[in-house]
Swiss-Prot record:
Name recorded for this polypeptide: Beta-amyrin 28-monooxygenase
Family: Belongs to the cytochrome P450 family.
Localization in the cell: Membrane
Residues annotated for heme binding in this entry: 427
Keyword Cytoplasm: no
Swiss-Prot/TrEMBL keywords: Heme, Iron, Membrane, Metal-binding, Monooxygenase, Oxidoreductase, Transmembrane, Transmembrane helix
Recorded topology in the membrane: Single-pass membrane protein
PANTHER family: CYTOCHROME P450 26 (PTHR24286), CYTOCHROME P450 716A1-RELATED (PTHR24286:SF349)
UniProt feature coiled coil, ranges: none
Function text: May be involved in saponin biosynthesis in fruit skin.
């Protein structure tokens, strides 16, 4: 009997040894080839993902990249992230290369969790779906459309502050910023303005957003499982809205130009076919994610920096009050007003330089190519990082200093300031985000000054930057 169990133990040990050997061999085989970039690959499956993520959790996502740039004396290095062989491109030259070679040498890549949350797309077709989406969006984000949104944004902002800020001594900024940007997205994308209807989406939407880019393990209790459940709930609600909009369009109760939902329902492809309800629901869901999370992070950090830098706040206040005093009672903001907010936008840009809502993004090499003398194999994942230029002294002298004058005149050098990405995949909602941020700034400084309640509150990045406790502040209302 003892010999039998000893034999089983030996077989088990041998099997594990062979399995580990094959795993290491397979892992390392992805990183073989002539003249690859310098770097290390870490453990099988894990690679350097834990260190990559942990620097963000500690509030310093740039450390992962700057440590390796210094170690290897190279602006491109190899690593292994999210179970994939990867090269990190750091610096303006790397940004320019990736942004300029979209759909030539590289194309977009998303973690598998994204495609599993959006089951109407496979990993291959999701890229085609993204292209279709970008053809639809210009109609919604063209200048004449954006001009119409400003008054709506101002109206929603006034209601938001009346409901959630007024008559309060203290507030927690981050959840309120998310509420504001989500309300705007619901109104402008789907014409949903009723706070109760918006609130029905709000909680499941935040569950979805927080679990979208996680380890795709669909087991009860995991963030990914909760994200799947939340996405199914939201889709069900969206399909009900879509069905009703179809009826309203047929009866003349809604118009094609009403919002992006109407536009999607009436748009056709090259063959004259309309999108089905599931496609539209997924596209609206993707727009809600893209049109809400990044702006809410930018707004939160605007509040943070204006609390820490009273002289910056005062200059923003002065500019905004000059605009406010030029308005008739009850008159909403318009396009001309927003164009006058030059200093305020410079402040917002400096905030996004120091705390970029979009930390970076992945591409995939669709062919072998050479960059900076190093070979990049087909199939490798490529990561560009906003922080690699935003916090580089070569791109921004004294990068730790808050200095809005960096954005005066011609502003930063090309490919150094990239909070919205760049090239063909630059965020199509960049101007939309600018408007909602400036409208928020106008309304908040008109009403309040504020102090941080936690002076040393930790910042975490997961995957966007956010104050660990949501940025609680004490409000000091201004007299009307």
């Amino acid at each position: 009997m003892e010999v039998f169990f000893l034999s089983l133990l030996l077989i088990f040990v041998l099997s594990v040894s062979i399995g580990l050997h094959l795993l290491f061999y397979k892992h390392r085989s992805h990183f073989t080839g002539p003249n690859l970039p310098p770097g290390k690959i870490g453990w099988p499956m894990v690679g350097e993902s834990l260190e990559f993520l942990s620097t963000g959790w500690k509030g310093h996502p740039e450390k992962f990249i700057f440590d390796r740039i210094s170690k290897y004396s190279s602006e491109v290095f190899k690593t292994s992230l999210l179970g994939e062989p990867a090269a990190v491109f750091a610096g303006a030259a790397g940004n320019k290369f990736l942004f300029s070679n979209e759909n030539k040498l590289v194309h977009a890549w998303w973690p598998s969790s994204v495609d599993k949350v959006f089951p109407s797309s496979t990993q291959t077709s999701s890229k085609e779906e993204a292209k279709k989406m970008r053809k639809l969006l210009p109609q919604f984000f063209k200048p004449e459309a954006l001009q119409r949104y400003i008054g709506i944004m101002d109206h929603i902002a006034q209601r938001h502050f009346a409901d959630s800020w007024d008559n309060r001594d203290e507030v927690i900024v981050f959840p309120l910023a998310k509420r504001f940007t989500f309300w705007l997205a619901c109104r402008l994308f789907m014409s949903i303005e009723d706070p109760a209807h918006v609130a029905k989406f709000e909680k499941p939407f935040h569950v979805l957003a927080s679990g979208l880019i996680t380890v795709p393990i669909d087991l009860p209790g995991t963030p990914f499982h909760r994200a799947i459940k939340a996405s199914n709930f939201i889709r069900k609600e969206l399909r009900a809205i879509i069905k009703q909009r179809k009826i309203d369009l047929a009866e003349g109760k809604a118009s094609q130009n009403q919002d992006i939902l109407s536009h999607m329902l009436l748009a056709t492809d090259e063959d004259g076919c309309h999108m089905n309800e599931m496609e539209i629901a997924d596209k609206i869901l993707g727009l809600l994610i893209g049109g809400h999370d990044t702006a809410s992070a930018a707004i939160t950090f605007l509040i943070k920096y204006m609390a820490e830098l009273p002289h910056i706040y005062e200059k923003v206040y002065e500019e905004q009050m000059e605009i406010a005093n030029s308005k008739a009672p009850g008159e909403l903001l318009n396009w001309d007003d927003v164009q006058k907010m030059r200093y305020s936008w410079n402040v917002a840009c400096e905030v996004m330089r120091l705390a970029p809502p979009l930390q970076g993004a992945f591409r995939e090499a669709i062919t072998d190519f050479v960059f900076n003398g190093f070979s990049i194999p087909k199939g490798w994942k490529l990561y560009w990082s906003a922080n690699s230029t935003h916090k580089s002294p070569e791109c921004f002298p004294q990068p730790e200093n808050f200095d809005p004058t960096r954005f005066e005149g011609d502003g930063p050098a090309p490919y150094t300031f990239v909070p919205f990405g760049g090239g063909p995949r630059m965020c199509p909602g960049k101007e939309y985000a600018r408007l909602e941020i400036l409208v928020f700034m106008h309304n908040v400084v008109k009403r309040f000054k504020w102090d941080k309640l936690l002076p040393d509150e930790k910042i975490i990045v997961d995957p966007m930057p956010m104050p660990a406790k949501g940025l609680p502040v004490r409000l000091h209302p201004r007299k009307p």
